[in-house]
């Protein structure tokens, strides 16, 4: 039975994740490296545990979260699908059970908003964890004069948290934004599709998605 640590400590896996991040860096994208995928893995695991799923189901989501962006090593376009295929081969090499592989690659192949669908709880957890990782430290470009809208939005987020209510009915993405760096409407301009996807993912887990910015609930 494959464990998260087997994947996390795999030299091949780490090489491909780092290579994928370098590719995106060259294209001007925000950080998609080990910091991002580790955060997504942890959040996906925590979401399922909080919602009463088993430790094993949560660990499978953790693995999927760690591998979800690996396809960027091939190309940004269709990286969810190429990543699922790459993860399939890596997981087979690591001796993973076919059932676990099936769940993981389904989650990876359906996580990107252009072709996404929260088809199972693992995928839903990965989507929420991935789209919820908005933070200043993901911005590579430190020249404010050359920021694009994605840089501005991420750089403006001073604090972020993804939490599930005590009664397990709402998952809330709570952001503190510096409005001198980015207007709230700028956030909506690039994240509207993502927020719609988060709402669908939350529904898959019997949750309602909420977005709170600077103390005001907007969704």
Predicted region positions:
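N-terminal low-complexity, intrinsically disordered segments
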Residues: 2, 28-51
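Short alpha-helix boundary/capping segments
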Residues: 32, 75-78, 186, 190
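Electropositive phosphate-/nucleotide-binding environments in soluble metabolic enzymes
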Residues: 14, 34, 38, 192
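Short hinge/gating elements
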Residues: 21-30, 181
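Divalent metal-dependent catalytic cores for phosphoryl transfer on phosphate-bearing substrates
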Residues: 25-26, 36, 49-164
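Amphipathic, well-packed alpha-helical segments that form the structural scaffold of globular domains
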Residues: 21, 41-45, 88
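Terminal helices and disordered tails flanking the catalytic cores of nucleotide-processing hydrolases
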Residues: 133-219
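Short alpha-helical hairpin
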Residues: 4-22
């Amino acid at each position: 039975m494959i464990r998260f640590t087997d994947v996390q400590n795999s030299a091949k896996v780490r090489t491909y994740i780092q290579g994928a991040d370098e590719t995106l860096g060259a294209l001007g994208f925000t950080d998609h490296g080990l910091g991002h995928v580790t955060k997504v893995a942890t959040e996906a695991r925590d979401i399922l545990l909080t919602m009463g799923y088993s430790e094993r189901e949560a660990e499978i989501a953790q693995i999927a979260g760690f591998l979800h962006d690996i396809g960027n090593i091939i190309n940004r376009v269709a990286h969810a699908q190429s990543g699922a295929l790459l993860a399939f081969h890596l997981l087979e090499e690591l001796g993973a059970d076919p059932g676990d592989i099936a769940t993981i690659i389904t989650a990876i192949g359906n996580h990107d908003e252009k072709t996404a669908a929260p088809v199972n709880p693992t995928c839903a957890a990965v989507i929420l964890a991935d789209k919820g990782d908005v933070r200043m430290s993901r911005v590579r470009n430190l020249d404010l004069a050359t920021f694009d809208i994605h840089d501005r939005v991420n750089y403006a987020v001073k604090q972020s948290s993804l939490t599930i209510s005590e009664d397990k009915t709402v998952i809330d993405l709570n952001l503190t934004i510096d409005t001198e760096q980015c207007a709230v409407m700028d956030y909506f301009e690039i994240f509207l599709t993502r927020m719609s996807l988060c709402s669908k993912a939350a529904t898959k887990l019997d949750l309602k998605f909420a977005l709170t910015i600077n103390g005001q609930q907007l969704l």
